[in-house]
């Protein structure tokens, strides 16, 4: 099944301490957002990309599209106050389509095969998300004292892209907006409707670049891929 993609690139990434939008930080000689967009741009099943950005930075992104020959960005949407608002704006900008994949621009290492698996699962189940099993011991803490050790056997760390039938995720966002509900990810809005969300095995290398330390991991992942 073909799909449309929404890629989020409006956050300023203050924890990166880069003095600019982290999407413009170079990773292996290319801006972070370019590496992310190239995955979707090179996927024949991707019909088009809506890029959510700060409107003051549109010109910078357009220059990157020209320089790196990114062809599938069909529309811009403005970033909102919260991530959820940014996604909603992106959904409003979609041209059409049955399946939408919503992805963080700061995750450049997603594989095309995972895009296909998620899109196909969204057709079957309505909603599908990638996740990896939690490896570390998780503690619930109160006032910097351990209150409880959480059983990690059923815990998964969720990633993006998250895939949905367009009609379902639109309904989920509309209902959340009416109720003033702010979720931690898009799948949580679908869960709120009582609808099932399918988990697919993700990839530990599909990291989100948030802090300067993440750049070190990203360079190592990039080097390992070049060596493959």
Curated annotation (Swiss-Prot):
Keywords: Isoprene biosynthesis, Nucleotidyltransferase, Transferase. Its EC number is 2.7.7.60. One of its GO terms (molecular function) is 2-C-methyl-D-erythritol 4-phosphate cytidylyltransferase activity. SUPFAM superfamilies: Nucleotide-diphospho-sugar transferases (SSF53448). The keyword DNA-binding does not apply. It comes from the Bacteria. The record marks 15, 22 as: Transition state stabilizer. Transmembrane segments: none annotated. Signal peptide: none annotated. It catalyses: 2-C-methyl-D-erythritol 4-phosphate + CTP + H(+) = 4-CDP-2-C-methyl-D-erythritol + diphosphate. One of its GO terms (biological process) is isopentenyl diphosphate biosynthetic process, methylerythritol 4-phosphate pathway. Pfam families: IspD. Belongs to the IspD/TarI cytidylyltransferase family. IspD subfamily. This is 2-C-methyl-D-erythritol 4-phosphate cytidylyltransferase. The lineage of its organism: Bacteria, Bacillati, Bacillota, Bacilli, Bacillales. The gene is ispD.
């Amino acid at each position: 099944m073909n799909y449309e993609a929404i890629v989020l690139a409006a956050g300023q990434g203050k924890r990166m301490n880069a003095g600019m939008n982290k999407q413009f930080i170079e990773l292996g000689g290319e801006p972070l957002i370019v590496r992310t967009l190239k995955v979707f741009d090179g996927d024949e099943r991707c019909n088009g990309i809506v890029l959510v950005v700060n409107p003051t930075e549109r010109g910078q992104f357009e220059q990157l599209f020209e320089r790196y020959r990114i062809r599938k960005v069909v529309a811009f949407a403005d970033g909102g106050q919260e991530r959820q608002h940014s996604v909603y704006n992106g959904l409003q900008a979609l041209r059409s389509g049955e399946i939408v994949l919503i992805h963080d621009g700061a995750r450049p290492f997603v594989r095309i095969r995972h895009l296909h698996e998620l899109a196909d699962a969204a057709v079957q189940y309505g909603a599908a998300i990638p996740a990896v099993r939690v490896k570390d011991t998780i503690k619930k803490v109160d006032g910097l004292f351990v209150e409880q050790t959480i059983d990690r056997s059923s815990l998964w760390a969720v990633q993006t892209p998250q895939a949905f039938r367009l009609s379902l995720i639109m309904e989920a966002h509309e209902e959340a907006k009416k109720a003033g509900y702010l979720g931690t990810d898009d799948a949580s809005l679908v869960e709120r409707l009582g609808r099932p969300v399918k988990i697919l095995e993700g990839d530990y290398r599909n990291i989100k670049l948030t802090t300067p330390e993440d750049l070190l991991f990203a360079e190592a992942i990039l080097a390992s891929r070049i060596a493959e």
